[in-house]
Amino acid sequence: MAAPTVEGAAVTALRSVLHRVRQAAERSGRTQEQIRVVAVSKTKPVSLIRQVYDAGHRSFGENYVQEIVDKAPQLPEDIKWHFVGHLQSNKAKTLLGGVPNLDMVEGVGNEKIANHLDKAVSNLGRKPLKVLVQVNTSGEESKSGIDPSSCLGIVEHVRLRCPNLEFAGLMTIGMPDYTSTPENFRTLLNCRAEVCKALGMAEDQCELSMGMSGDFEQAIEMGSTSVRIGSTIFGPREYAKKQQN
């Protein structure tokens, strides 16, 4: 009886999150439909993901290559998978080959990763892959991502040197304790303004993926177009064994 209770709780939690997203969107002068909610399902079983899928959700995220490659074939093809973890360059081919319905890679933090993804897309004959450039807005050495001062350079590299990638926007991960969240998000907003001005893009053509379980409402109020929600929907992570990227 325990499993149905947990799965029911995930669907209830999803509806609560979507309600909060709608309220935050309205406070920022937008609609819920303008905000993507990526349900991050790392360490969670396929059966639980299926429950959330059956409730109408379609955007899901995973942090580990092996996990998403294992799960994706067991789930419906109309899921839009987002890879939201740190991607090692030698895993790009495995990721793309194993997940035909991979919609986006969030977290291109250097030219090497961009080049490997571009080559993998070309070799597999896939349509151009949407990517977000990851910006390290908190300055933490433990985090991936480009320094804000180098953001424009890698965006230009993706747009000019990677014909099989589609630059879709920017992403960042705030501080774990959310102490500097407003500053982190403001930095990403500044990066977007710089990129759009330099490239002649409208700002609404450049997505902002910022905001997680503990700060997604504030992120939306500050302009986020995509939030990554894991534990608030699925419950605490279950690390039965060490995950490998």
Regions found by a protein language model. Name each.
Residues 2-214, 222, 234-236:
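Conserved alpha/beta-domain cores
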Residues 75-77, 242-245:
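Short low-complexity, flexible loop/linker segments enriched in glycine and/or proline
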Residues 224-242:
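Gly/Pro- and small hydrophobic-enriched strand-loop and loop-to-helix capping segments
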